[in-house]
């Protein structure tokens, strides 16, 4: 008898719902791509039919992405961030940090610590596995973390930890 251990990964409610929306959109798009392939096939010679090849490529991408998103959703463990509390940085925390700029002026940044599946630096969502995210995990308000970045090292001070 063999047993398989399924690795669950944490994800925020927002991240889970975003993945569900993506899956729904992909499944809605698939029939129109199948129809485009059929229409292109009806045009005759497929060897020089760019529409056919583009539609087949798009269908392959969509089918692969559907499988990937379904797999992620089946292995996701939704963490209700609002039910967490404390002053220690952990998954789901919204962390305010400050650092000194090159001109010695202090600047604050706000990041939410999330899984790699929902990380998006442009939205200040950083992964627990990123250099800054992993440095912050387990630290408390008032503590400092040093992070190696391409142009050297940056020192961050944890100003606030929230769960919202």
Describe every region a protein language model picked out.
Residues 4, 39, 71-72, 119, ...:
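Preference for short coil/turn "hinge" residues that link or interrupt alpha-helices
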Residues 65-72, 76-83:
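Structured, basic alpha/beta domains of bacterial-type, RNA-associated proteins
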Residues 1-67:
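Helix-rich terminal scaffold detector
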Residues 27-30, 44, 73-77, 140:
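Conserved NTP-handling cores and scaffolds of large molecular machines
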Residues 79-156, 162-164:
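Non-DNA-binding regulatory cores of transcription-related proteins
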């Amino acid at each position: 008898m063999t047993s398989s251990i399924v690795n669950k990964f944490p994800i925020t409610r927002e991240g889970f719902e975003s993945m569900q929306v993506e899956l729904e959109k992909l499944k809605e798009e698939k029939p129109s791509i199948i129809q485009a392939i059929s229409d292109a096939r009806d045009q005759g010679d497929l060897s020089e039919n760019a529409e056919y090849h583009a539609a087949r490529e798009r269908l392959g991408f969509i089918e692969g992405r559907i499988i990937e998103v379904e797999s992620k959703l089946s292995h996701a463990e939704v963490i209700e961030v609002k039910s967490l509390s404390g002053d220690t940085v952990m998954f789901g925390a919204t962390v305010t940090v400050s650092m000194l700029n090159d001109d010695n002026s202090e600047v604050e940044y706000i990041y939410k610590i999330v899984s790699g599946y929902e990380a998006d630096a442009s939205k200040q969502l950083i992964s627990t596995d990123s250099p800054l995210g992993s440095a912050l995990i387990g630290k408390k308000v008032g503590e400092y973390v040093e992070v190696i970045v391409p142009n050297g090292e940056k020192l961050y001070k944890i100003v606030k930890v929230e769960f919202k």
